[in-house]
Amino acid sequence: MPVSLVIDNRQKQVEIEQKLIMLLEKAVITSLAYEGWDPDYEVSLSFVSNKEIQNLNRTYRGKDYATDVLSFPLVDDTDGFPMGEEKLLGDVVISVEKAVEQAKEYQHSFEREMGFLMVHSLFHLMGYDHLEETEAQEMRKREEIVLTEMGLVRE
């Protein structure tokens, strides 16, 4: 079964077009494939405002500011799923408002920023982190490989 991306658009600042959804699905598929994971996962993706992501960041991470993306992994081990059962990889929450701001700041397209945030979040869902410098370098290297494969290079 192919990847399932369940979308919940809770913001009104930017219209989310089908082309963007397809790009984000490709980000999931490409990230999973790079890591050698089966593509048959469900990922929940919520588009929110800065205000909502700030509330979530405060609640779940104790950090009272708007961030760009939050990841909530639901999988530790891929061996524990019975045949045919839906595999829930996790939840991704993206502040579309923050993505617009960062695309302008980094002088690249909104689509490139959204693709980066999705790939970044996927690596968190697959167990990567960036608390230590060596972890951050490894995660960044993997993200750049996937983004390049998708054609989302820095402009």
Swiss-Prot record:
Pfam families according to UniProt: YbeY
Entry note: cofactor: Binds 1 zinc ion.
EC numbers, comma separated: 3.1.-.-
Single Gene Ontology BP annotation: rRNA processing
Subcellular localization: Cytoplasm
GO cellular component, one term: cytoplasm
InterPro entries (UniProt xref): MetalPrtase_cat_dom_sf_prd, YbeY
Tree of life domain: Bacteria
Single annotated GO MF: metalloendopeptidase activity
UniProt: Zn(2+) binding residues: 120, 124, 130
Cofactor(s) demanded: Zn(2+)
Swiss-Prot/TrEMBL keywords: Cytoplasm, Endonuclease, Hydrolase, Metal-binding, Nuclease, Ribosome biogenesis, rRNA processing, Zinc
Chief location category: cytoplasm
Function: Single strand-specific metallo-endoribonuclease involved in late-stage 70S ribosome quality control and in maturation of the 3' terminus of the 16S rRNA.
NCBIfam families: rRNA maturation RNase YbeY
Sequence similarity: Belongs to the endoribonuclease YbeY family.
Name assigned to this protein: Endoribonuclease YbeY
Organism: Alkaliphilus metalliredigens (strain QYMF)
